[in-house]
C-alpha cells in the first residue's frame, strides 16, 4: 500500500519570479507528497547541478520544462511501484539513473523534488508529521529540539541591489526559550530597524531574503545601525541577541590576484588580512557566527581562520562544504571550520542530506539548516531542522511570505511537540 503509484511534476515560479520544479508523489493507499525546490544566487562551484532549459526565448533561459519532463517520464518509470518507506532505495535509484557525480544528467532539482515528495507521502501514509518521519530516518532517540533561528535583517552582496559587500547581517535571539519568543524578538528588532532607516532617509525596500537593503557607508555601518535597533527594541547585545554574518567571500575573491575586495570600502585583502579584518569585527561586536569567511578554494586560508577564530565562534562552511560528505570529511580531517550549512539542493537527495548532517553531528561540528535566496512556500527545511535536531536554522527575515512560511511551520511544530519542548542552547562560543 505504500508503493508509488504515480508522479506528477510541473513548472511553477519561485520568490524571484524564476521557474522552478514542483512534484507530487502519489501512493497506492491515496497518500500524496508535494515538494517544490528553491534556487540560490551565490552558489558553490561544487554544488549538484540545477537543470535549466537554457532557451533564451523563454524565461531568459531559466525554464525547467526539461526537468519536469524527466520527472514525468524517466524518474516516474524508474521508481514506479517502489516502496516509499524505503527512502534510501528511492534516492539510490535516482542517483544511479543520473550516473554523474554532480547530477548533471537529469538534474538535482528533478531528483530532489521527487526525493522530498516521497518522504512527505510516506509521512502522510504513516499518519505522522514530516519532522517525526525525518527523525525516524535519522535515528534520533532523544527529545526533539526547536532550532534557534539566524534572522537575516540586512541584505547585501548578491541578495540585494545595494553597496554592502557582506551578503547577510543576521541576528540570533539567544535569549529566547521558545521559537515563538525567538520570532517575536526578531520581528521587534526588524520593525525598529525599519523605523531607524526611514528616519535617516534610507530606503526601506527589502532584498531577496526579506532583509532591508540600504546603501550604507561601509560594512561596519551595518553593525552600528543594527546595534542601535537592538538597543532601541529593549534588548541587550551579547546577552539577548548576537550577530551572525555570511560573507559569501567567494563573491569577493579574485582568483588571479588571490585577494578579497570590499568595494564599499575600496579595500583589498589577502586571505590572512581578511581573517584579521573579521577577527577585529569579532572583538568589537558580539559576532558569534561567520559563514564562508573565505573563498571555497582557499583551504590554507581557512586553516588560519579556524586556528584564529574557531575556538571563539562558529565558522560555517556553505560554499566550502556544499552539503557534501566527501568534502566535509576532508574539512574535518584538516580542522577546517567547525560548522556546516545544510542546503538540500546543494546535494540533491534527502538521504545524502541526512548523511551530511549525521557526519557533522558525529564529528562535533554544528549544523545549520538553510533556505536559498530564491525560495518557494515549501516548508520542508523547518521539519528537517527539527527532525534532525540540527539546532539552528537560516530562513531569512520576518518578511516575505516564502520566508515567514518556514517560521510559521516552526510555530506549528513547537505547538505539536508541547510546552516542555526546548530550543537549542548548546553554544560554545565566547561573547
Swiss-Prot record:
(2R)-2-phosphoglycerate binds at residues 167, 343, 372-373, 394. One of its GO terms (molecular function) is magnesium ion binding. It holds the Pfam family Enolase_C. Pathway: Carbohydrate degradation; glycolysis; pyruvate from D-glyceraldehyde 3-phosphate: step 4/5. Its EC number is 4.2.1.11. PROSITE patterns: ENOLASE. The keyword Metal-binding applies. Binds a second Mg(2+) ion via substrate during catalysis. The active site is at 209 (proton donor), 343 (proton acceptor). It catalyses: (2R)-2-phosphoglycerate = phosphoenolpyruvate + H2O. Gene3D superfamilies: Enolase-like C-terminal domain (3.20.20.120), Enolase-like, N-terminal domain (3.30.390.10). GO terms for biological process: glycolytic process. InterPro entries: Enolase, Enolase-like_C_sf, Enolase-like_N, Enolase_C, Enolase_CS, Enolase_N. Its cofactor is Mg(2+). Mg(2+) binds at residues 246, 291, 318. It is found in: Cytoplasm; Secreted; Cell surface. GO terms for cellular component: cell surface; extracellular region; phosphopyruvate hydratase complex. Keywords: Cytoplasm, Glycolysis, Lyase, Magnesium, Metal-binding, Secreted. It comes from the Bacteria. SUPFAM superfamilies: Enolase C-terminal domain-like, Enolase N-terminal domain-like. Component of the RNA degradosome, a multiprotein complex involved in RNA processing and mRNA degradation. Catalyzes the reversible conversion of 2-phosphoglycerate (2-PG) into phosphoenolpyruvate (PEP). It is essential for the degradation of carbohydrates via glycolysis. Belongs to the enolase family. This is Enolase. It comes from Buchnera aphidicola subsp. Baizongia pistaciae (strain Bp).
Amino acid at each position: 500500500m505504500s508503493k508509488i503509484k504515480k508522479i506528477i511534476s510541473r513548472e511553477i515560479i519561485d520568490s524571484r519570479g524564476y521557474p522552478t520544479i514542483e512534484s507530487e508523489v502519489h501512493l497506492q493507499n491515496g497518500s500524496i507528497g508535494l515538494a517544490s525546490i528553491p534556487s540560490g544566487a551565490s552558489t558553490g562551484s561544487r554544488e549538484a547541478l540545477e537543470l535549466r532549459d537554457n532557451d533564451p526565448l523563454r524565461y531568459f533561459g531559466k525554464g525547467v520544462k526539461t526537468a519536469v519532463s524527466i520527472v514525468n517520464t524517466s524518474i516516474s518509470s524508474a521508481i514506479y511501484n517502489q516502496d516509499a518507506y524505503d527512502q534510501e532505495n528511492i534516492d539510490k535509484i535516482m542517483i544511479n539513473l543520473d550516473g554523474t557525480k554532480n547530477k548533471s544528467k537529469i538534474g538535482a532539482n528533478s531528483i530532489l523534488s521527487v526525493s522530498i515528495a516521497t518522504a512527505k507521502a510516506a509521512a502522510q501514509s504513516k499518519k505522522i508529521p514530516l519532522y517525526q518521519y525525518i527523525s525516524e530516518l535519522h535515528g534520533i532517540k532523544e527529545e526533539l529540539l526547536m532550532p534557534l533561528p539566524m534572522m537575516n535583517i540586512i541584505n547585501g552582496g548578491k541578495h540585494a541591489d545595494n553597496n554592502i559587500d557582506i551578503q547577510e547581517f543576521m541576528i540570533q535571539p539567544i535569549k529566547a526559550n521558545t521559537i515563538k519568543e525567538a520570532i517575536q524578538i526578531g520581528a521587534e528588532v526588524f520593525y525598529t530597524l525599519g523605523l531607524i532607516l526611514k528616519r535617516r532617509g534610507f530606503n526601506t525596500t527589502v532584498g531577496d531574503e526579506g532583509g532591508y537593503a540600504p546603501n550604507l557607508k561601509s560594512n561596519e555601518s551595518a553593525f552600528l545601525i543594527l546595534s542601535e535597533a537592538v538597543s532601541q527594541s529593549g534588548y541587550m547585545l551579547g546577552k539577548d541577541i548576537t550577530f551572525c554574518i555570511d560573507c559569501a567571500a567567494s563573491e569577493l575573491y579574485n582568483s588571479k590576484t588571490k585577494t578579497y575586495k570590499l568595494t564599499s570600502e575600496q579595500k583589498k585583502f589577502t586571505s590572512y588580512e581578511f581573517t584579521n579584518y573579521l577577527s577585529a569585527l569579532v572583538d568589537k561586536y558580539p559576532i558569534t557566527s561567520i559563514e564562508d569567511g573565505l573563498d571555497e578554494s582557499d583551504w590554507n586560508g581557512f586553516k588560519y581562520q579556524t586556528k584564529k577564530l574557531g575556538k571563539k565562534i562558529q565558522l560555517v562552511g556553505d560554499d566550502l562544504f556544499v552539503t557534501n560528505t566527501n568534502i566535509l570529511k576532508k574539512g574535518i580531517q584538516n580542522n577546517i571550520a567547525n560548522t556546516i550549512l545544510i542546503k538540500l539542493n546543494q546535494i540533491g537527495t534527502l538521504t545524502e542530506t541526512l548523511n551530511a548532517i549525521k557526519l557533522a553531528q558525529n564529528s562535533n561540528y554544528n549544523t545549520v539548516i538553510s533556505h536559498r535566496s530564491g525560495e518557494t512556500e515549501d516548508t520542508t527545511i523547518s521539519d528537517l531542522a527539527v527532525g534532525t535536531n540540527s539546532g539552528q536554522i537560516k530562513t531569512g527575515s520576518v518578511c516575505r511570505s516564502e520566508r515567514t512560511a518556514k517560521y510559521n511551520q516552526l510555530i506549528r511544530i513547537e505547538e505539536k511537540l508541547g510546552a516542555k519542548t526546548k530550543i537549542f542552547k548548546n553554544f560554545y562560543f565566547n561573547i
